[in-house]
Amino acid sequence: MSAMLSVKDLAVSFQTRRGEVGAVKGISFEVSKGEILGIVGESGSGKSVTSYALMRILDAGGVIKAGDATYSGIDLRRSSERDMRDIRGREISMIFQNPRAALNPIRKVGHQIEDVLRHHSRATRYDAKAKAIAALEAVKINDAEARYNAYPFELSGGMCQRIVCAIALACDPRLLIADEPTTGLDITTQKAVMDLVRDLIRERSMSSILITHDLGLAAQYCDRILVMKDGVIVEQGDPVQIFSNPQHSYSRKLVDATPRVGTDVRSLLPPEDRGDELVPVVSDRPLLEVRDLNKIYAGKSGPVHAVKGISFTINQGQCVGLVGESGCGKSTTSEILVRLMDATSGEIIFDGDDIAQVPANGFAKDGRRADIQMVFQDATDSLNPRHTSRQTIAEPLRRLGKMRGVKLTARIEELAALVGLPLSLLDRFPHQLSGGQKARVGIARAVALEPKFLILDEPTAALDVSIQAVVLNLLVDLRAKLGLSYLFVSHDLHVVRLLCDHVIVMKDGEIVEQGPSQEIMSNPQSDYTKTLLAAAPKPPARRQAN
């Protein structure tokens, strides 16, 4: 196969207040015609910077220091900016990580597709509209003419990602760069988007670079994989070979940290970090009983029944998984249980009392507030950027625990030790912490008041696999040490399989199936559960050393 893209000795640096920082350090690779190349690695590995360098859209301070990048005979590094404007979109196009950030919120999506068409093909307004609608149909958007006039905020995350795909593919580029195209999407939407991208690439005889931290996704959709660490390619090869028999220690670490069938939560960690396994004690005594819970919102076209008469029980010490696609009602259920909003009807029996009788806006002053806490999906968004880790952990202790002085300081340091946060990080702000460190701060804040029940809302969704492994093991240990009960909200069925004793599957506001985790995962009864399991990426098995 002839190379469509050839990269040789590419080096990229950023100028910072502390001096020059090398982000990409002399990497070389090729992309053949018709090939899907995966670039995998954790945050800071240089994979996204590589793609931005190829497109010549580096952030301020970024400079290509050395190397060459040649696309179909065109020198991308030395082409003029005017030439690059023609190349972007028409020859090389990009799907960005956050679809909502990539779309203009105050312009109709159809007009945003037209912009690309009119710039690159000089189409008339009439022709551009027809081609924009055709682009929407190509990415399998139903009722494309109506969606043409929609604004991004009127569409789901999966729909917005399809719009971004339509924009990227509108001018029939020959090379598509997809930068974390499924981050934040539920599992069936992720599969639909990736199947769509793969099929369009095959139909149009394109090439593609898939940038991701999800090795399972790369293994399923890529012809070849590069593994990057600290700006360097440490290994490359066939996905099955890399997954089954990784040669580099970093590749082995990533592969072992990827949840899949046949693994347990301790095996995600390197052997030297596993320690003694702590086994949670699950009681037969119910801690939380939800009975016939309903939530109805007032919508423009009539009432919206978000939660429809659901019932379930969580025992003391038990971890229950709540899974389903976006819009199934799991987040609404979580917010009702943590008393951020009121139910329309139903009972929430917590430790013998019906807390649904206490209005949500008054629950902060209720004595049971400390017993129910939440760990949020995005640790960055859930932390006050102006508060240090110490101040964040101290807040519930001051407000609800009435702690002050030496006692407060001692408790903060005790909590930091409990979640594995070095004391040296207590006086740092969120922007000075890694994703895993921010997750530890959020967990420390949640357990500060010794709650009985934690709601975990996608707590590892935005984390790299090795950091996810550490956080999952921390949650298992805390559950055993503190006797906590969890409601674990997630769309990652591999993680739910590892962590949860019991699973609840929701669809359209209803529970379609629930039962013991292993039973649900190995022998699902509902067609919907079967669909969710079929959509989950299936990484190749790891070959065990003799």
Give short role names for the model-derived ranges.
Residues A150-L155, M159, F429-L433, Q437:
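Conserved ABC ATPase signature
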Residues I64-D75, G346-Q357:
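Conserved ABC transporter NBD signature motif
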Residues V40-G41, V323-E325:
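The feature captures the beta-strand-to-loop junction immediately N-terminal to the Walker
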Residues D75, D127-A146, D354, K407-S424, ...:
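Conserved ABC ATPase "signature" region
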Residues A3, N142-Y148, P239-E289, K300-P303, ...:
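Short catalytic/signature loops enriched in Gly
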Residues G89, F153, C171, L449:
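Conserved signature/switch motifs of ABC ATPase nucleotide-binding domains
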